[in-house]
Amino acid sequence: MLWVIGINHKVEVDIRQKFSLIKTKLQEKLISLKKLANEVIILSTCNRTEIYFFSEEYVDIEKIFTELDWDKRYMHLFYIYKDKDCIKHLFEVVCGFDSLLIGEDQIVAQVKEAKEISKLVGGKNPVLERLFEVALKCSKEFRTKARLNEHPITIASVVGKVLKESNIRKIAIIGLGNIGILFCNYFKNSDVDKVFLIGRKNEKIDQFVKLNPEKFRYYDKKKTILEAQCLICSTSAPHSVVHKDDIPEGKNLLIFDLAVPRDVDVEVYELPNVKVIDIDQVHKIDTINREFRISKMQENYHIIDKYVDEFIDWLEFRQYRNLIMEMKRHAEQLCKAQVKYIKNVDSRERKEVERLLIRMANLYIDRAIEVLREAHKEGSGEICSNLIKRIFLK
């Protein structure tokens, strides 16, 4: 059974942040959830928390909430998609349909990262890894055909448009992870004067400082807030990092709080000269090529349907995997047995003959697999598999 449970940007950030899974805790959470299902992948971003499962049977949602220590009063806000609906949902997500910024491409890197983090836990996720790989393949073709790469949209470009319209030229970035890097990439070619960097130093951020030290520099948070006209907050901290006491009295300041959980304490929102825009409000100012993106995405939706069908075919064909493995094992045993009858050859030559026989046997098996695949698509897979058993295994 393939299914996903999740909560996304359609639920307000104040509630959504209660279920955000911090990156440093993801491996620990994956280990806990592996008690409930054979395969698990967590996709956790500022816009969504989704858990994908592949298991023999569906897991009770209450067990998941218990394992993650989540408040069960909010269970009704979560969606659950099963089998084909689950596949379709992931493909829509990675193609940008289910984003605050329609068509944005940051989700592609986030889906890749989710797949890689699941590998660190150990154990195999053959079905979910294949699902995510096909989703990424689908996204690549979809974005190319829909020409989304010609008109890219990111949270940085949306925020950058606001800053330009407001003539803001001194910006502070608090949090130097993936979002921080995204903004640095955007600002390196913009006409802002200063970009103050607050957070843990890393090699990628160092490159911006080295290439343009006049624009980019690491700075102390307190001094930064005195000088900056705008704060862009995107840390992965489980608590707020900007408080009322950090803001000088009467200071005019624009803050983009892009983190989930929030980086900015609620008291800051109430300061008279401070305007805070959170992650859920960003989509309201997304006007860059929006109609073009929506139109092109709708025109190319058939690409998603194609990949959904492709994955379902692969998933259904997996029922024959034991038969295929048994055929190959049986063929290898027969080849090794026949080699024993060869006389007057040394061990190296015997091994070479054995490899050649196994290779030839696999050519016939591969053809049998193709015939089985064709029969399965035509609805006669069971008849064909029984015939293959009689030919190859009896």
UniProtKB/Swiss-Prot annotation:
EC number in record: 1.2.1.70
Residues holding NADP(+): G175, L176, G177, N178, I179, G180
Site (Important for activity): H89
Keywords attached to this entry: NADP, Oxidoreductase, Porphyrin biosynthesis
Biological function: Catalyzes the NADPH-dependent reduction of glutamyl-tRNA(Glu) to glutamate 1-semialdehyde (GSA).
HAMAP family from the UniProt entry: Glu_tRNA_reductase
Keyword Oxidoreductase tagged: yes
Protein's UniProt name: Glutamyl-tRNA reductase
Organism: Caldicellulosiruptor bescii (strain ATCC BAA-1888 / DSM 6725 / KCTC 15123 / Z-1320) (Anaerocellum thermophilum)
A GO MF term: NADP binding
Enzyme class (EC, first level): oxidoreductase
